[in-house]
Amino acid sequence: MLNMYEEFPFWYTLFTEAGFDVKLSSESDFHRYEQALGSVMSDNICFPAKLVHSHIQELDDMLASGADDVQKFIFMPYVVFEPMDDSRNTNSYNCPIVSAYSDVIRSAMKLKNDVISPVINFRDEKLLQKQICNFLKGYGINKKEANMAFAEAQDAQHSYVTDIQQKAEQILAQSRRDGQLTILLAGRPYHTDPLIQHKLSEMIAALGVNVISDDIVRGNLSVGAGDTCLVRQWAYMNRLIKAGQWCAEQPFDVHYVQMTSFGCGPDSFIQDEIRIIMKKHGKPFTLLKIDDVSNIGSLKLRVRSLIESLSEQKQGEGEHKKQSEKSIKATGEQQKGAYKLPPVKRHILAPYFTEYLTPVVPPLCRLFGWDVEVMPQSDAESAELGLKYANNEVCYPATLIVGDFVKALKSGRYDIDNVSLVMSQTGGQCRATNYTALIRRAIDANGFSNVPLITIGVATQMGEDYGEEDNLDVPWLKMAPIIATSLLYGDVISKMYHGAVSRLKAEARRPEDKFANQAEQLREHYLTAVAEPILRNKPSEIMDLISEAALAFDAITDDKEIPAVGIVGEIFLKFSPFAHQFLAQRIIEKGFEVVPPLLTPFFLQEFVNAIAQKNMGLKSSKMPDFVLKSIYQLIWRRQKKMNALASKFRYYRPFTNIFEEAEAAKGVVSFAAQFGEGWLLPSDIISMVNQGVNNVASLQPFGCIANHIVSK
């Protein structure tokens, strides 16, 4: 199942050396798969994830029929990091589904046995050893025995990796001696499952072509890491891109074919990158999409056509090499001409995010010395342009943001020689880290390759350093009071507006000027008024505005109890009115109170995450927990003061303590779920329920790999 295809030699050796009796589920079977489909919670999740349910059900039945006097459990490790086998990569994450699907299994399936999922970090051997010793200690294995088992397991895994790499090299060498074609059949480790890949490797071999896997490039630093715009964050993705680069540089007797599962989030990003690599070297890129279909006739036909085509093209190897050299040279010249001046001297365009953040961003950035303009919110043209210039399988927020930037640059409103774009980079396992690559490709395709794209890190997810040249370093510490107060202010105004707009007095419901009612008018007034205190760097004046706003909103509000609907979900989708098709407004028009999503918890969760990363063995840190908690207490003190001031509005819903919210979510998902909204999404729901909100809408884009876990 999922990551077990990659590390089974390690786990089998570890458990057997520690005295466990290891039982393995049977080979994947379509009949058992169909029997377990009823517990699958997402129709558009990838086939390998759906298949997990049948394996878990079989293991549960197997253990239930065994002896009752022994300790039994189903082992499904929560592997966040794979080994970092190439120092040129940024990180070695698994995708959220591979890491965290055990959380979904426990929620979706009624099992007789426990599913045990220790958090695992294969990237750092010392931390891994500590994790293993702590895990085995719970089963009565002392440290000495655990260390011995760990050493044997590491040796077994190393031997396995070396063996499959050498086997691929041997097959290639023999293939060349025999003058035969070789196909590098690339995919995730779970694509070795015959049911998942529909025996593609055997199908190709039966046509007289030798097959090797992407394992041939494992740990080989003499192979290029891959010419790509992407942040190299996912372990499997890194290997696929590297294998594509290696294959592109080989003679025309080696070709690249990639298997991908429908709904694979990372592949929607990397397939275009590998296609570009192949095109530069004059080689075809073949992508085979596979799913749980039983009729694979069309797949066989495509494979046969591919092999026949490659056999004919092999004679044109010299011509392809010439095209390759020309393409690489042109690309290199374009990169040398890229803009390198400090972005601070340019007009900076930022994407629209939420109506409660947009008015705060320009004055905050002016305080830092930046000239930032927030673009208008997305519209139908944004969606159309995003679909045109980004892969159609990327997540919906990426489509809109790409479209927004392209639309702005093509509008003719800006001096292209004096404009930059800025985009946040969240880090972690979510695809949002690589939105910048999509934006870069899209604006280049429209002739704006000289426009710099600036990235701002908004999280400290497990210590990434992206090493970008065009970065803006936000002075978080120096400006912390005004930044925190400004962001919290936006959330406070949102709480007041949504608490008031469905309870307006009769006279307050009348349209006035351009506003539909007085609640909208007050919202606009107080979101505009905050600019001056921000520019003066006066957090205390912002606090005064909160007190004033509370009285103003209260004055237009009737005493009225109405049902409430909370909104949670993917961060862009739940905030952007166009992205969620104005859902919040429609709920308000039906007479319900909307309990709005808040922005500040997304940042404040980092205090919990940093402590959790250290305690779970995902990150080394010498900073004591009390230091982080003390820093948070300064913010919490500000939040409590805001609560006191804003409580003059009778329907104000106060901020809650982020550590208390995290504690409430502990039994729902692992704290290692730090992708997307992570554990914050279930904690938001729990917090709303505790406030008496019994209706919650969870908004997620189709195919969101983070929300496949946390929202389900």
Q: Where are each of the predicted segments found?
A:
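An N-terminal assembly and electron-transfer interface module characteristic of large anaerobic redox
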Residues: M1-K712
